[in-house]
Amino acid sequence: MISYSSIAKASLKDVWEHFIYKIDNPQHFVPGVSNIIIKEKNDDYVIRQMNIQMKDGPKNKVVEKITSVPYHVKFEIIEHLVFTVHVDNFAEFISEKETKVTYAMHWKNKATGEMQTNETIIKDAVLKTIAFIEGY
């Protein structure tokens, strides 16, 4: 598992609202996302399909099952050619104007069993999320 945390200059309520918005609009939060399709949505989960273009890598189609409870959103990839993956997004109250944002990524290569350890991926996603929340 790799994780990264940073502080958003926003209330917990604002961060949480952006986390929920991210379910339907990941392109504002995750680098390299395109062709987003919400395949199913109910009170318990969302099934989302999209393409992700990794930096200097191939474009991959992924299908995710997304669940959310305050203040945690879990993105579990249920269709990916190379990896088994789940990513957790956490929001933690710091003060009325600051919230700790943490992403934890559990990526495992299906063929080799090797865990993904590229911390730049998760750091870039957290920083892009915070920049969007803060309006940059």
Predicted regions and their residues:
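Beta-strand elements of well-folded, non-transmembrane domains
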Residues: 8-12, 54-56, 105-109
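Glycine-rich portal/gate segments that line the openings of hydrophobic small-molecule binding cavities
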Residues: 37-80
